[in-house]
């Protein structure tokens, strides 16, 4: 049974800001070793590490209050904001530059490509088999006030849907498929 993406609770943007301020002078490794009862402790550490590491690659997204950055292991595989924007504009032009269009991202991952497509007017459906990433994609869609539909599964599970464009990141495909 798939996880209920709508009922997952994350720390608020206020909680994240407080954590970043309180632990500003701590290094990531020390924080990971520190025992803490906060159920979001590891996620908060990931946010600190993400802010330090990704602010150059994702300058716009790192500035959005409440936007959750993925774990660094996932973010390293993701497009930079500039690359994602280029791909989105290229795809948007290829389908005739409509003001609004339906897109499918079969390799949701960190969501930076999805975000870029949404900046070009796409109403996105995103598939992501990883529960944690799918939940973050859903949360971030709400933070960005996008009406994206997130499906925690592989794209092959889609039974219906008509899309103007389909995007698959080749670096995330398994065995080239």
List the model feature ranges, each with a label.
Residues 1-177:
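SAM-dependent transferase fold signal centered on methyltransferase-like domains
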């Amino acid at each position: 049974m798939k996880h209920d993406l709508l009922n997952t609770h994350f720390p608020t943007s206020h909680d994240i800001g407080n954590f970043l301020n309180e632990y500003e002078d701590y290094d990531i490794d020390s924080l990971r070793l520190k025992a803490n009862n906060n159920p979001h402790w590891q996620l908060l550490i990931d946010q600190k590490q993400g802010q330090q590491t990704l602010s150059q690659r994702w300058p716009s997204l790192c500035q959005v209050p409440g936007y959750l950055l993925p774990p660094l292991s996932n973010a390293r595989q993701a497009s930079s904001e500039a690359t994602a924007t280029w791909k989105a504009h290229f795809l948007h032009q290829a389908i005739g530059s409509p003001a609004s269009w339906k897109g499918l991202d079969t390799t949701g991952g960190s969501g930076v490509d999805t975000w870029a497509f949404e900046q070009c007017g796409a109403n996105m459906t995103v598939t992501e088999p990883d529960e944690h990433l799918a939940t973050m994609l859903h949360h971030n869609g709400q933070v960005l006030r996008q009406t994206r539909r997130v499906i925690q599964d592989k794209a092959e599970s889609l039974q219906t849907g008509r899309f103007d464009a389909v995007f698959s990141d080749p670096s995330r495909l398994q065995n080239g498929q």
